[in-house]
Every structure is written in C-alpha cells, then in structure tokens.
C-alpha cells in the first residue's frame, strides 16, 4: 500500500481500522449491507460508531452494523435493483471502476463471481471499504487506481461496471476505450450516466457546473451515448432503463456533510438544475465486445 497518498488524518484512521478487534459477526444482504455482531459490548459499539462518523461523508449505501444504521446520501439499492435482473456473474472475473466504498461489490458477492476487483483513486472511500471489510472479511481486491490505469493492469475481466463516472471524464470516448482494453473476449460493460432527454446526436457541456458539481464535462443524449460506445468499438448497445433522479434516491442525511439533490435543483422548477439545465436523469446501458 502506498501511504504517500494518505494525509496524516487518513493514516490515523487507517491505523484505527487495522487495530479494531476481530469481531464475531455475520454478514447478510438486503437493500442494506448488514453486519450482525455477537456479544458486542457498549464500549466496542461506541468505537465502531465513532469510527464510522469519522469516515463521513457516506455517499453510497446504506449499511447496517448491528443497530448502527449508516443512512448514506444515495439509496444505492435503487440503482443496483435496476441492474440486478441483467446480471450473470457466477464464476466470472468482475471489476467495478469507480467503486466508491464497495457497496455494489458487496452486493455482487451473492452472485458467486470468481473474483471482484474495485478501482477508485479516492483514499476516503478506500478507508470506508477497509472499515466495512474488517467485519465482512470478503476477498474483494480494492485498487487505489483510476480508469486510466486499466490498460496496464495485469488482469482482465469478464464483466465491468462503471457507474456514474463517464460524465466526470473530459474525454469520454478515451475512457470507454480504456474500459474495453480491460475486458476479456466476449466481455460486457454495464454503464450508468446522466443523460439529456432530447433527440439528437449531441451532449451538454456545462459552462461551469451542472447540479452544483464542478467536474461534469459532457452529459450526452442517448443517441450520443450510443455513438460514443460504437466509436470505442463496443457493440450490442442495450438500454436497460432510464430514471429521473429524485429525492427518494438522493437526499441529505446525518451521514453526509454539505448539500444534496434538493439544493441542486431550481427551487421554483425541479425539472431544472440550479443553473437552469435539465434536471438529472440517468440511463443504464449494457454493451459488449
């Protein structure tokens, strides 16, 4: 592990995680990722709770650690439940690019894949994963790497998930090509992106921010998204579902700092962002090579 990527506070949190006791606990899945502890005294429960608080903000989830409910900003099971009917992961090598704290990877464990590897350069979300996996004890491999590292990464994958990443990239076609290099022959990519619900082969390129987010480069129409995928030499573009992002799926909770969706929309017209652009809608697609 390259500790040069960690600041001093993050090193301290990592040390606290690694020094946690090896608890007797059971892992289960529902809409939340659940850990049930056996014989957990109040002092240990307080230690777990305080460590979870130190790892705010929690964007993906939720997680239930005994009776500690980490109510994340995103109700991530909504997205996972959209993808679930289309998943066939048994015996496959799976990657989640932009894996955040591992919520989706933990959910994938029930599909009996051969392996799961997560890629995300965020030390913060890596620490959240390390904290959770201290109790879950999965064999998930978390790499502090971004999508640009995939062409040189040693392993290849049968299925790759890349959810909520492409609009953060200044060259989306290059990103798709990088994802393609990491797939085995016959592999598939599940992609989720914000999109513009209009006809035409174009993408919105926000002047400064979109929904108060500074690093949004291109929000495509569905037709433009398909064109990107085909230019990257993917085939069998399949639109699985579209969905408007609403206040049930993304909202402020005590487990995040700052604002959430209600602050990002025009208070007089929730079909628009605060900047006047169309409000976020998401498209879920699958492509193959």
Swiss-Prot record:
Looking at the UniProt entry, the stretches that span the membrane are none
Q: Which GO terms describe its molecular function?
A: transferase activity, transferring alkyl or aryl (other than methyl) groups
Report which reactions are catalysed by this protein. carboxy-S-adenosyl-L-methionine + 5-hydroxyuridine(34) in tRNA = 5-carboxymethoxyuridine(34) in tRNA + S-adenosyl-L-homocysteine + H(+)
Q: Which UniProt keywords apply?
A: Transferase, tRNA processing
Question: Record's Pfam families?
Answer: Methyltransf_9
What role does this protein play?
Catalyzes carboxymethyl transfer from carboxy-S-adenosyl-L-methionine (Cx-SAM) to 5-hydroxyuridine (ho5U) to form 5-carboxymethoxyuridine (cmo5U) at position 34 in tRNAs.
**The protein, known as:** tRNA U34 carboxymethyltransferase
- Tell me what organism the protein belongs to: Campylobacter concisus (strain 13826)
């Amino acid at each position: 592990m390259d500790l040069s990527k960690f600041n001093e506070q993050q090193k301290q949190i990592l040390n606290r995680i690694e020094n946690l006791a090896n608890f007797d606990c059971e892992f289960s899945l529902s809409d939340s990722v659940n850990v049930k502890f056996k014989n957990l005294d109040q002092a240990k429960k307080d230690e777990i709770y305080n460590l979870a608080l130190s790892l705010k903000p929690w964007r993906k989830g939720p997680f239930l650690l005994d009776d500690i409910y980490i109510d994340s900003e995103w109700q991530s099971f909504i997205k996972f439940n959209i993808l679930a009917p289309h998943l066939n992961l048994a015996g496959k090598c799976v990657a989640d690019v932009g894996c955040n704290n591992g919520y989706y990877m933990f959910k994938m464990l029930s599909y009996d894949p051969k392996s799961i590897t997560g890629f995300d350069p965020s030390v913060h979300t890596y620490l959240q994963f390390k904290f959770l996996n201290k109790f879950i004890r999965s064999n998930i491999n978390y790499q502090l790497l971004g999508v640009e590292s995939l062409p040189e990464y040693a392993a290849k994958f049968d299925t790759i998930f890349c959810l909520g990443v492409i609009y953060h990239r200044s060259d989306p076609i290059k990103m798709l090509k990088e994802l393609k290099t990491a797939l085995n022959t016959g592999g598939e990519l599940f992609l989720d992106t914000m999109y513009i619900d209009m006809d035409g082969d174009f993408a919105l390129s926000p002047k400064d921010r979109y929904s108060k987010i500074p690093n949004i480069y291109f929000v495509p129409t569905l037709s433009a998204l398909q064109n990107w995928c085909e230019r990257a030499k993917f085939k069998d573009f399949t639109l699985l579902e579209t969905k408007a992002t609403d206040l049930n799926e993304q909202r402020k909770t005590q487990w995040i700092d700052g604002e959430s969706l209600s602050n990002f929309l025009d208070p007089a017209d929730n079909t628009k962002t605060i900047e006047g652009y169309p409000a976020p809608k998401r498209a879920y697609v699958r492509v193959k090579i």
